[in-house]
């Protein structure tokens, strides 16, 4: 799981200020961090089906947030996906 220091680092990097935890960019970045952690976890624990289900749920949640962000603010969306390395 992402610890408190990593969350603060993500919030300070992608948020407008230190306490900006609810903006779409921060939410997408936090979900991406959790997805990366679960992906590594599932490489060693292949039979952990509940974590796999949680991973798929997070991917769907991130996809819907990305779709919303793309419609809302295209330029910020492009900056975010380039920072996170999500698309080519």
Curated annotation (Swiss-Prot):
Keywords in alphabetical order: Ribonucleoprotein, Ribosomal protein, RNA-binding, rRNA-binding
GO CC annotations, alphabetized: cytosolic small ribosomal subunit
A molecular function GO annotation: structural constituent of ribosome
Single Gene Ontology BP annotation: translation
Pfam families noted in UniProt: Ribosomal_S15
Keyword Lipid biosynthesis part of the UniProt annotation: no
Protein task: One of the primary rRNA binding proteins, it binds directly to 16S rRNA where it helps nucleate assembly of the platform of the 30S subunit by binding and bridging several RNA helices of the 16S rRNA.
Annotated family: Belongs to the universal ribosomal protein uS15 family.
Subunit-structure text: Part of the 30S ribosomal subunit. Forms a bridge to the 50S subunit in the 70S ribosome, contacting the 23S rRNA.
Full protein name: Small ribosomal subunit protein uS15
Species of the source: Borrelia garinii subsp. bavariensis (strain ATCC BAA-2496 / DSM 23469 / PBi) (Borreliella bavariensis)
Gene that produces this protein: rpsO
